[in-house]
């Protein structure tokens, strides 16, 4: 067997403008082939970096120009050896929201954030003891939506859970704006335009 690796693909002939129907595609490995499993790539919002999962448990980022690789989150937050975990870049490219296995409570996942520069600690945002999954940045990166089964029928015997969509705010201002009624929100928008 082989190992999973990450490749870029582009149309080889300039006259072919439609990727799905191109007759010749050029593939190039993003990193040299190794014994490490690399998969689930996501380009950074500015397109200069590529995040990926390595060995099914680590969140890594490669600078596409220099090919320098940094670790963002190590394997102490993942105990599964299946097909990785869900993660997503923040809109400004400075953070990741990701699923983690907090407190070795496998298989139950929590939602966490970690700095994309690889220098910060992973911060567990949910710590629920139930399945929290599928984080998505919303409100221009000021909040994260995620699925949770903490309030529905719960998965106590490995079957039959229900999930709700939850939101966690990254700052007080985003929370305060979210709580405004429609009339107050419109007044706030007018005031912000006037000040700008």
Describe each PLM feature range.
Residues 1-19, 32-38, 48-64, 74-82, ...:
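A flexible loop/linker signature enriched in serine peptidases of the S9 family
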Residues 22-30:
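A short helix->beta-strand "capping" segment at the edge of beta-propeller domains
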Residues 28-29, 70, 123:
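Structural signal for short hydrophobic segments within the conserved structured cores
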Residues 44, 115:
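Residue-level recognition of the GNAT/N-acetyltransferase active site
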Residues 45-46, 91-92, 139-140:
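Residue-level detector of Asp-centered blade-edge/turn motifs that repeat once per structural unit
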Residues 85:
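DHp/HisKA histidine-phosphotransfer helix
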Residues 88, 139, 160-163:
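Generic structural microfeature
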